[in-house]
Amino acid sequence: MGRVEDGGTTEELEDWDPGTSALPAPGIKQGPREQTGTGPLSQKCWEPEPDAPSQPGPALWSRGRARTQALAGGSSLQQLDPENTGFIGADTFTGLVHSHELPLDPAKLDMLVALAQSNEQGQVCYQELVDLISSKRSSSFKRAIANGQRALPRDGPLDEPGLGVYKRFVRYVAYEILPCEVDRRWYFYRHRSCPPPVFMASVTLAQIIVFLCYGARLNKWVLQTYHPEYMKSPLVYHPGHRARAWRFLTYMFMHVGLEQLGFNALLQLMIGVPLEMVHGLLRISLLYLAGVLAGSLTVSITDMRAPVVGGSGGVYALCSAHLANVVMNWAGMRCPYKLLRMVLALVCMSSEVGRAVWLRFSPPLPASGPQPSFMAHLAGAVVGVSMGLTILRSYEERLRDQCGWWVVLLAYGTFLLFAVFWNVFAYDLLGAHIPPPP
């Protein structure tokens, strides 16, 4: 709690909580008269226009002035505006933003600076400063900017010709992934190349290395699962090795053959990397690994005799989340040939599922045992439509503030607990006949 003196009275203020403050009502302008109170913000006051309706009491304006004082860090308005014009320069405002510890994350501070610099005169008036600091905001700062009609300039860098190769790629990613123009401009403005999208690239590289090692060792590059030695890998999930918990995740590094690896690697790079650039390593890695884990656990429940290989659970989680996001925001997406690309993606994904179904029910070789299950593909798609869509729709918003996120997280946690108990008790209770592990 803090206190500020204004006009001879002392107002007790709330802690800085942007969600509880309000925009100054219309009809208020900055008056020239001086106040007699102490404190730097008492040099100028808010004064209603002659024809304006009655306004709330001074407490509302005191809150705005107190929050502005927090930004000014003790500097008087006379020092910031020595000529008493009612404006401060954008450069001065930028220095204030970055030189004081405000309870806003760096991205939001950057947006404050961007809004200040978007002014044609390069100035910020006192009214705008109070609006920026004390305006009521939703859980997403950039949506508050949109609601408050404070977006980046329409002729911003997204439409500039002569951009470098990397900036053109960033613009392409913004158009491909984000459905809202405000989001696209916000992403383009604040994107930094460091850290790079290392997760999807690292996973893809590791999968290729593992495939090359086993291919060279077995001299088999297609349908490697028919080779009995391949299924003996400590990375493959097999129902006879359920106690080795790492196999529920590490199976994503093994693949049936070149055909499955090529399909998964292509989608991971074409869809996974742009998603990671926009939404960050933590969210996309969480979604990918959640799809992988759900895939192996679903197989352990629905196809108890089958092993699992391949990263299809994670790949289908990413792809289904992205496709669902495109469908739900069809009008706002700017990617070209949306319908054609959607149909092509669905055909390719369906073909991969068909290949996996054929492989699962094809007659196995005597020494190879049952072939890998296709249920991981379907489980990954379910994770993508539920958890993944929630993540993709929460761009620049904290997931913990989203009610849907907690619902999805609770459902996923319940599934995990059920799957763990199933793997511990159900196999023995049901007398499931499990093929001996290789």
UniProtKB/Swiss-Prot annotation:
InterPro entries: EF-hand-dom_pair, Peptidase_S54_rhomboid_dom, Rhomboid-like_sf, Rhomboid_IM_Serine_Proteases. Detected in heart, brain, skeletal muscle and kidney. The active site is at 312 (nucleophile), 377. GO terms for cellular component: membrane; plasma membrane. GO terms for biological process: proteolysis; signal transduction. The chain crosses the membrane at residues 196-216, 262-282, 284-304, 308-328, 340-359, 372-392, 405-425. The keyword Methyltransferase does not apply. Its EC number is 3.4.21.105. Residues 1-62 are annotated as: Disordered. It holds the Pfam family Rhomboid. It catalyses: Cleaves type-1 transmembrane domains using a catalytic dyad composed of serine and histidine that are contributed by different transmembrane domains. GO terms for molecular function: serine-type endopeptidase activity. Its main location: membrane. SUPFAM superfamilies: EF-hand, Rhomboid-like. It comes from the Eukaryota. It is a multi-pass membrane protein. Disulfide bonds: none annotated. It is found in: Membrane. Residues 8-17 have a biased composition (Acidic residues). Keywords: Hydrolase, Membrane, Protease, Serine protease, Transmembrane, Transmembrane helix. May be involved in regulated intramembrane proteolysis and the subsequent release of functional polypeptides from their membrane anchors. Belongs to the peptidase S54 family. PANTHER family: RHOMBOID-RELATED PROTEIN, RHOMBOID-RELATED PROTEIN 1. This is Rhomboid-related protein 1. It comes from Homo sapiens.
